[in-house]
Amino acid sequence: MRCNHTLCVVAITFLVSWSQTLSTPVESRRTESPLVRSVSATEERNIFSQTAEAVAKWGTTTALLNLGKTDDEVKKILGLEKLSGEALKAHSNYHLLDDFITKLRDRKVTGWLHKDTTTDEVWKTLQLDDLFAKLDAKEFRHSDELKTYVQYVKKLDDDIWNYKRASFEPDSSSPLELAVKIHIWAKAKRPSWHVLEMMGNNALKGSKNRKFYREYLLLIKGKKPIIDF
């Protein structure tokens, strides 16, 4: 309840501030021509409308996030639970769902980073092996779960690359997980020595997963197309 109250106060304060800003030039406009006043008033109305919409969107999705709602619960709240595909995207409330999912994904990724969560733990948490078995390749590639995993791998890899953090890469990555990772590394143009370090024992000669390192080399040499997850 306190969270909702705070959001309302912030939104109202912001809107009041804008309304005061929009009402300030009234005196100066009296000396302007009717055409100039008309254009100016229209522009101001557009700015106010866009700002009010942005504040409402931020307040709605942030409140739902802070209440601990899941994406399925938010779909129901927004009247989207029975829609899918293009029908879902065409609904006037879809932008709220999309914004909520993005914020939820960002929050999850940030939390995992703070806990130094390994990538295979994230993979298992998102149940991606099970999801892959249920969906076709295209559906899996565009799933929210895989997008969340890819975002985490990218952020963790950037952290390791830019700040020389210790690698948290475990040796228990599933073959499917490694198949996704090599494309992420290739897209980021990581050198082979970095990939060897990240793969750990998986890249050693004699390992059954060594094939993914060889696959990575083909990707960075342009002999195979890189999938942009």
Swiss-Prot record:
Entry's induction text: Expression is specifically induced early in the infection process, in contact with host tissue.
Q: What is the official name of this protein in its record?
A: Secreted RxLR effector protein PITG_22926
Key words, A-Z:
Host nucleus, Secreted, Signal, Virulence
**Regarding domains, what does the record say?**
The RxLR-dEER motif acts to carry the protein into the host cell cytoplasm through binding to cell surface phosphatidylinositol-3-phosphate.
Which species is this UniProt entry from?
A: Phytophthora infestans (strain T30-4) (Potato late blight agent)
- Gene Ontology CC annotations of this record: extracellular region; host cell nucleus
Domain of life of the organism encoding this protein: Eukaryota
Major place of localization?
A: secreted
Q: In which family does this protein belong, per the annotation?
A: Belongs to the RxLR effector family.
Subcellular location, record wording:
Secreted; Host nucleus
| Function description | Secreted effector that acts as a RNA silencing suppressor, probably by inhibiting the biogenesis of small RNAs in the host plant, to manipulate host immune responses and promote Phytophthora infection.
Motif RxLR-dEER is found at 34-45
As given in the record, the signal peptide range reads 1-23
